[in-house]
Amino acid sequence: MSDDYYPWATAIRSDRMLGFQRLTILGATTLAFTPMLALADNARDWQNLPTDLNMVFGYYNRIDTNTPIDTSLPIDGLSLNANLYIARYARSFAIDGRNSAIQILQPYADISASFDNSRFFDGTKHNGGMADTQVVLVHNLFGGPALTKEEFANWTPETFMTGALWVTAPTGDYDKDRVINIGSNRWAFKPEIAFGTPIGPTWLELNGYVSLYGDNDDYQGNRTLEQKPLYGVEGHFSYTFNRALWASLDATYNRGGETRIDGDWQDNKQENALLGASMGFMLSPQFGGLIAYSDTVSERTGSADVNTWTLRLQYAW
């Protein structure tokens, strides 16, 4: 394969090509998901990549759930189908010798909703618009040194721990008189710790996070919505078939998030578990994607019951 096919490789000797091929597949699968809307990460999202790398992502998510688009807020009797599209940009850089990154996500949702008990309306309602913008700050704690593309080509992946802070701004479409909104009309912060270790051709990854919510003072009219933290942990066990293909088994567990409306606790603490699988692929050293599926296998009464298909395409340069 010529350097025209690997445009980053012009400064890398042919005996380093194997490492460079690893660079392209890792670089295009890192920092790669939409944990937006209380969804989980994907496998290999937080592995190391070279510094000064730009990445753009496009997502299509098909979601069937008993919640609004903000999946931290189940509503009794609700059945919602959503087509969620997300544009995402990420750039990596060095801080104090460790790899860091900043990401920006802008979702758009097209939804249809109905109620089994006609609690709020009859029939099916449709809505579409922009969801809340997210900014993500990422910094490696160990196992992810800041490396140029040439240095990364000769580097062997190692056990790592990375921290991230997700900030969700209330920029999405919101109407206080609607039952089902696309925006959440509140700030949210999600600190996250991601751990991963390579085991031969496999990766074992464990992530933990907590979602912290601001108040919504215009909830279903002029009521005030408060919510306790929602805690989550997830695991991924992935296998590398070759430099252009890997697959993963995924699991997620969430607990907490009880809400209070105008000072009255709603006795709706959430608890659910999801299982899924995913497959990442590369079509060229810069262009690739992912297909993923997850489904709720156990949930406490009143908790989120979510079924999600995800298609992601990404390009790195």
Can you name each region flagged by the protein language model?
Residues D52, S79-Y85, H126-V135, T159, ...:
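Residues that define the transmembrane beta-barrel architecture of outer-membrane proteins
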Residues N54-V56, S100-I104, T159-L165, F189, ...:
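Transmembrane beta-strands of outer-membrane beta-barrel proteins
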Residues G58, A87-R91, V135-L141, L165, ...:
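Residues on the lipid-exposed face of transmembrane beta-strands in outer-membrane beta-barrel proteins
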Residues N66-T67, G97-S100, G144-P145, P201-L204, ...:
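Repeated loop/turn-to-beta-strand initiation elements of outer-membrane beta-barrel proteins
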Residues I63-L84, D122-G123, K176-I180:
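Surface-exposed strand-loop-strand hairpins of Gram-negative outer-membrane beta-barrel proteins
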Residues Q220-W317:
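Outer membrane beta-barrel transmembrane domains
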Residues D110-E226:
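Outer-membrane pore/translocation modules
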